[in-house]
């Protein structure tokens, strides 16, 4: 099934540190998994200059679209990036992976998830969302969607109800299947009311793991599967 994804556009960066000084400079606790701000992200990027690193386009939906392209499906990805080299890299990497990029662009630096690897091997993760979650419904056009049979949306975007609801409405109007990934049980707990509303109305395909299914239904996994299967075509 030809599928277009909608998710947070984040570049995954792995950086091998010569020492742990940068962690103290940036204000991240060693071994932590933290959200970081733009000032911290700029400090990290300056510290990367000349150090061994690797990077890849990331974000759960983007990774899924890349996998689908490898399997031969037509795949696209909608996201929002900044006007910097990281955003340029993200766009070019998707093209090389045969995933069509549909990016809204803004001034500033793009989002990224940076894994800082200390000399002793311990990993510290800092995620800077940047412009990724600020994409608006108006930046997602019917022209983008009409070339596909399905849209795949990550649950992390539920923080933007207008974006998710409006995009689902556009997709259904055009005859697309709507697939939703619940993403995390904390997301389910935070947006249970919204999920109760949009899943029966718009969602055809629902992805969840055991903990997410239990959080959504309030039932044990084997019972949760039955309930979910009654609400959507595929779960």
Where is each model-derived feature located?
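A glycine-rich helix N-cap at a beta->alpha junction
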Residues: 93-110
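Conserved phosphate-binding/catalytic loop of the ribokinase/pfkB sugar-kinase fold
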Residues: 102-105, 115-158
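Conserved phosphate/ATP/ADP-binding segment of small-molecule kinases
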Residues: 174-177, 183-235
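Glycine-rich phosphate/adenosyl-contacting loop at the front of the ribokinase-like
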Residues: 1-78
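Hydrophobic beta-strand scaffold residues
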Residues: 75, 101, 178-179, 235
């Amino acid at each position: 099934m030809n599928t277009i994804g909608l998710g947070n556009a984040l570049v995954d960066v792995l950086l091998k540190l010569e020492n742990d000084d940068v962690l103290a400079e940036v204000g991240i606790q060693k071994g932590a998994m933290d959200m970081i701000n733009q000032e911290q992200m700029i400090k990290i990027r300056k510290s990367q200059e000349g150090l061994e690193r690797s990077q890849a386009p990331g974000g759960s939906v983007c990774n899924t679209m890349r996998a689908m392209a490898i399997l031969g499906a037509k795949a696209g990805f909608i996201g929002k990036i900044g006007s910097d080299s990281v955003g340029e890299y993200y766009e070019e990497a998707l093209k090389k992976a045969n995933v069509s990029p549909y990016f809204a662009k803004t001034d500033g630096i793009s989002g990224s998830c940076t894994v800082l690897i200390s000399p002793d091997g311990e990993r510290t993760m800092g995620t800077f969302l940047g412009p990724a979650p600020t994409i608006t419904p108006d930046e997602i056009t019917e022209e983008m969607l009409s070339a596909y049979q399905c849209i795949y949306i990550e649950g992390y975007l539920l923080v933007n109800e207008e974006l998710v609801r409006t995009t689902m409405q556009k997709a259904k109007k055009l005859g697309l299947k709507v697939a939703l990934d619940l993403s995390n049980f904390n997301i389910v707990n935070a947006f249970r009311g919204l999920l109760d509303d949009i899943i029966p109305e718009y969602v055809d395909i629902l992805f969840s793991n055991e903990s997410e299914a239990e959080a959504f239904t309030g039932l044990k996994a084997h019972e949760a599967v039955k309930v979910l299967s009654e609400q959507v075509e595929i779960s």
